[in-house]
């Protein structure tokens, strides 16, 4: 069975049944090599940095948490819970956020959180990173809010070291991948063009403009915004 689906638009020309069948037969005749899975044995961080030191340790009597101050000024709050014994949750935050950037970066900020990890980290593409992390219970995602910069993650106790390595890589070695970004942009533009055919979207846009006094920071992303979005600029903002 061959199926073809797409939006019902006058400017889109779909292949005929005969053309689909012809392409299907051609594809069957092409030589296809068996897929070979390649997984790198390279460590996430080839050379570990010099370890830091704990400058101060104290107890928060209100929450029963341990508060550490590291020699780089970062404060770490450790709180033991018994909600889930095989999971460690981590949230890191610092003042900052999207409001620190001017009007020229508003469109870049609309896709900022989606784009910054597209290229992977360190020596690993996003695809290779997923392969290396297969079988591990670990996740790490940097992001930006209105007035904060954040890194959220979780790990099983056995994979906590991997979580810290990912945090380090996203801080020190974010990776660009132009091909991955182009694929993301093309998908988003196609999705947004179809979305904008829905009259309820136009209604929602008008409502948002009225509520937020036409503030461009509150507007949703549109297909046209990608003309102003710059992948290199986003990665520069991230760093």
Stretch-by-stretch model annotation:
Residues 64, 76, 136-137, 233-235:
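Short structured motifs
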Residues 60, 226-233:
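Short secondary-structure boundary/capping elements
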Residues 1-6, 77-79, 84-173, 185-193, ...:
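M16 family metallopeptidases and their MPP-like homologs
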Residues 72, 128, 233:
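Ca2+-coordinating acidic residues in Ca2+-binding motifs
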Residues 1-103:
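Proteolytic maturation boundary segments
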Residues 205, 231-239:
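Non-catalytic, conformational "gating/processing" segments within enzyme and secreted inhibitor domains
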